[in-house]
Amino acid sequence: MMEQSLIPQTPVLPLTAQRTVKRALTLLDRHLRETGVAFTSTQAARDWLKLKMAGLEREEFMMLYLNQQNQLIAHETLFAGSISSTEVHPREVVKRALYFNAAAVILAHNHPSGDTTPSQADKTITQRLVQALQLVDIRVPDHLIVGGRQIYSFAEHGLL
């Protein structure tokens, strides 16, 4: 599984705050992996993703792999790009979802600019990913865009 720095080193966040956020992420991650804890809504995923992705300086595409009961199996950053884009490959997305034997995946990426409005490219790749994953019976409950403290939900806007 690919690893990423939990807290980016930035002059905006003091070291003590970075440590606090890192501890919070660890506790939340542990809680989400407990037996019986499920993503019955995407709120838990949103809270976790805000902590995880809000301070990133370049665009990254992440996946949360869920089992049949919507419990978190694993998560990883699949692709990383520049400050304004990242290239996402549907073949790799499907391959990783199958590797984890996921029944569902929550897609997520960040917009370092802070503007969570999806681009046409975001909408197009989301549809391609949903179609590719449907071919192997994997659900996509949501695609979330993190920008600062804001999150855009494709599901809430009827784009899935």
Curated annotation (Swiss-Prot):
GO biological process: cellular response to heat; cellular response to reactive oxygen species; cellular stress response to acidic pH; proteolysis
Keywords of this entry: Hydrolase, Metal-binding, Metalloprotease, Protease, Zinc
Motif (JAMM motif) on chain: 109-122
Residue intervals of the MPN domain: 38-160
Record bears the keyword Protease: yes
A Pfam family matched in the record: RadC
Protein's UniProt keywords contain Zinc: yes
InterPro entries xrefs: MPN, RadC_JAB, UPF0758, UPF0758_CS
Annotated positions binding Zn(2+): 109, 111, 122
Any one GO MF annotation of this record: metal ion binding
NCBIfam families assigned to the protein according to its UniProt record, in alphabetical order: radc (TIGR00608)
Family membership: Belongs to the UPF0758 family.
Protein's recorded name: UPF0758 protein YfjY
